[in-house]
């Protein structure tokens, strides 16, 4: 289904193929990603939408995922779009330290909705920061600790690293603490995906279980423009957001230590 949409709508179709929060993350990314000829690492690239966007705005991109299937899907989609500026790697981010030398340095790193999948989250963030050039930036997002459980989501996940969440979420203070302990200066922080996006995500998950993904996607599609009301309604209702995100810049002292 994703490949059919790709032929008609291009890379942007990947932003609306999954749940509505994917588009929300891209909107945040668009405001914080450096454009132009910079080297970008997408750590935990998923369906590749953010990697494709980074390539489209001039970045030299390396996209990594532990899933060979995701990487093969990404390779096929990039070829279909005529995209040549993305290098693909199958990497278990828990073992990132073993790959640092071969991967090199980056001007910016995207790590969205990934650290909640690993027990050693602080270690992973420190490894990512060590891969940044001086004054490079890390764009980091993770589930918000106070969000309401989505349909089928475990509020008390198992600590076993099996690909699912090992942690329910992070407070903004905790995410900032992790970043600062890794020698990042946090320059911006915010929330992603409010009440509308979460309700649409729940609806899509329920419909997918009952009717399958194509039917669920078609039913939810006309409702997606309601996301324009997401921020104001979330404020009025005081509804907790789904994710917390930050942009951190590598401190000069940390840059010197990483050499």
Where are these regions (language model features)?
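Conserved N-terminal segment of class I S-adenosyl-L-methionine
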Residues: 1-104, 108, 112, 122-125, ...
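Short glycine/proline- and charge-enriched loop/turn segments
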Residues: 10, 154-162, 203-209
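A short His-aromatic
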Residues: 113-117
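Helix-to-beta-strand junctions that scaffold the AdoMet/dcAdoMet cofactor pocket
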Residues: 118-119, 132-134
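Short N-terminal helix/helix-N-cap motif within the alpha/beta-hydrolase-1
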Residues: 119-123, 150
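Short, glycine-/aromatic-enriched active-site segment of Class I SAM-dependent methyltransferases
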Residues: 141-166, 177
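Conserved S-adenosyl-L-methionine
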Residues: 184-195
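C-terminal helical/coil "lid" or tail adjacent to the Rossmann-like core of SAM-dependent
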Residues: 197-227
């Amino acid at each position: 289904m994703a490949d059919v949409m790709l032929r008609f709508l291009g890379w942007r179709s990947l932003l609306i193929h999954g749940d509505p929060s994917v588009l929300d993350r891209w909107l945040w990314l668009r405001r914080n990603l450096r454009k132009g000829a910079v080297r970008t690492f997408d750590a935990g690239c998923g369906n590749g939408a953010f990697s494709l966007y980074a390539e489209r705005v001039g970045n030299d991109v390396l996209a990594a995922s532990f899933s060979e299937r995701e990487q093969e899907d990404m390779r096929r989609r990039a070829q279909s779009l005529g995209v040549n500026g993305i290098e693909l790697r199958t990497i278990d981010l828990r073992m990132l330290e073993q790959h640092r030398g071969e991967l090199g340095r980056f001007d910016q790193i995207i790590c969205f909705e990934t650290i909640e999948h690993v027990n050693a989250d602080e270690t992973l963030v420190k490894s990512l920061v060590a891969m940044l050039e001086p004054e490079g930036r890390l764009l980091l997002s993770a589930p918000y600790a106070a969000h309401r459980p989505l349909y089928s989501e475990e509020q008390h996940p198992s600590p076993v690293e099996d690909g699912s969440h090992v942690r329910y979420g992070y407070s903004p203070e905790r995410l900032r603490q992790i970043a600062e302990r890794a020698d990042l200066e946090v320059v911006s922080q915010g929330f992603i995906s409010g009440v509308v996006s979460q309700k649409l995500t729940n609806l899509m998950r329920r419909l997918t279980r009952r009717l399958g993904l194509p039917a669920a996607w078609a039913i939810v599609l006309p409702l997606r423009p309601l996301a324009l009301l997401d921020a104001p309604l979330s404020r009025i209702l005081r509804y907790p957001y789904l994710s917390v995100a930050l942009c951190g810049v590598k401190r000069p002292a940390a840059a010197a230590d990483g050499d």
